Amino acid sequence: MTFAKGILAALALAAAVGQASATELEHWPAPAARQLNALIEANANKGAYAVFDMDNTSYRYDLEESLLPYLEMKGVLTRDRLDPSLKLIPFKDQAGHKESLFSYYYRLCEIDDMVCYPWVAQVFSGFTLRELKGYVDELMAYGKPIPATYYDGDKLATLDVEPPRVFSGQRELYNKLMENGIEVYVISAAHEELVRMVAADPRYGYNAKPENVIGVTTLLKNRKTGELTTARKQIAEGKYDPKANLDLEVTPYLWTPATWMAGKQAAILTYIDRWKRPILVAGDTPDSDGYMLFNGTAENGVHLWVNRKAKYMEQINGMIKQHSAAQAKAGLPVTADRNWVIVTPEQIQ
């Protein structure tokens, strides 16, 4: 009897400790938290998974768009060290002013997002992962805006670029999902290695598995042997070791699928599952995240939207109507207008 009581006491203590350590969605509006908690309860420990965008979805602001001017400010990323293959158009130098790489990136975006999206991942070529990790950690700790210049037409303009700020709410959600046996994946339009430096580093609290971080991939080169590889290749071959990759150099040569627009949905099919769809997809950009939000989310899953711009909210509402009508016309279950959780950055900061 004493032994049985001891066992029961131990089990009760273990349960209490488990409850005490369980993550709660404290940085969420109450209705959103209830909907997310219900989703987690319904899918706990059943082999389900969730997919998150990173920039402006999992943290506030953009990693590459702030790392670029930060490294320019430090003088370590310059036009002179830019890979020749990335000099796509002439630089727009004016009397007394040499165009910044940040400005150059903006002008590439004016041509087409399909030009600047890969470029802003490729621009970090020539550095080792170890070097970039040091700079990413510096940026995350910087805590103040980074001055940058760009052209508004032919007029030189200035702006302050904010470094990423962790969304407390998303950090909670990542961990609560994983605590309940729901795998968390990141699919980002930023360079996979850069995003991994935040999402998989325990200091930032997301605790994503390194191999579950998926993004724009460029070949990595061993400077001593010339051998080429990528994390995605290593993961597929079952021999991925993030620490062993730290001294590999980032090259500008792109790997596919490219993880923006339809490529995000392609990444789910390529790297996660051909048939099982995520129970939650989170994003903030209609064009880049729209495919995985509408085509990727499971029938009873949640579309999680971070409403950071009024024009994007208007655009996503238009897409909801358009895709709902298209589903109905095709005789498919209408899911595009169901199960949306919409929050602002301020609500989950």
Swiss-Prot record:
Changing residue 64 to A: Shows half of the catalytic efficiency with pNPP as substrate. Increases specific activity with phosphorylcholine, but shows a 2-fold decrease in catalytic efficiency. Decreases inhibition by high concentrations of phosphorylcholine. It catalyses: phosphocholine + H2O = choline + phosphate; phosphoethanolamine + H2O = ethanolamine + phosphate. It is an enzyme of class 3 (hydrolase). Changing residue 289 to E: Retains 3% of activity. Still activated by Mg(2+), Zn(2+) or Cu(2+). Slight decrease in inhibition by tetramethylammonium chloride. The active site is at residues 53, 55. Residues 1-22 form the signal peptide. It comes from the Bacteria. Gene3D superfamilies: 1.20.1440.310, HAD superfamily/HAD-like. Induction: Induced in the presence of choline, betaine, glycine betaine or dimethylglycine. Induction is mediated by the transcriptional regulator GbdR. The nitrogen regulatory protein NtrC is necessary for full pchP expression. Expression is also partially dependent on the sigma-54 factor. Induced via GbdR in bovine lung surfactant and mouse BALF. Its EC number is 3.1.3.75. Keywords: Disulfide bond, Hydrolase, Magnesium, Metal-binding, Periplasm, Signal, Virulence. Activity is inhibited by high concentrations of phosphorylcholine, phosphorylethanolamine, choline or betaine. Displays different properties depending on the substrate utilized, the pH conditions as well as the presence or absence of metal ions. At pH 5, activity is inhibited by Al(3+) ions. At pH 7.4, the enzyme cannot catalyze the hydrolysis of pNPP, phosphorylethanolamine is a poor substrate in either the presence or absence of divalent cations, and activity measured with phosphorylcholine is independent of divalent cations or is not inhibited by Al(3+) ions. Changing residue 109 to A: Slight decrease in inhibition by tetramethylammonium chloride. Its cofactor is Mg(2+). Optimum pH is dependent on the substrate: optimum pH is 5-8 with phosphorylcholine, 6 with phosphorylethanolamine and 5 with pNPP. GO terms for cellular component: periplasmic space. It is found in: Periplasm. Catalyzes the hydrolysis of phosphorylcholine (PCho) to produce choline and inorganic phosphate. Can also hydrolyze phosphorylethanolamine and the nonphysiological substrate p-nitrophenylphosphate (pNPP). Shows higher affinity and catalytic efficiency with phosphorylcholine as substrate. Belongs to the HAD-like hydrolase superfamily. This is Phosphorylcholine phosphatase. It comes from Pseudomonas aeruginosa (strain ATCC 15692 / DSM 22644 / CIP 104116 / JCM 14847 / LMG 12228 / 1C / PRS 101 / PAO1). The lineage of its organism: Bacteria, Pseudomonadati, Pseudomonadota, Gammaproteobacteria, Pseudomonadales. The gene is pchP.
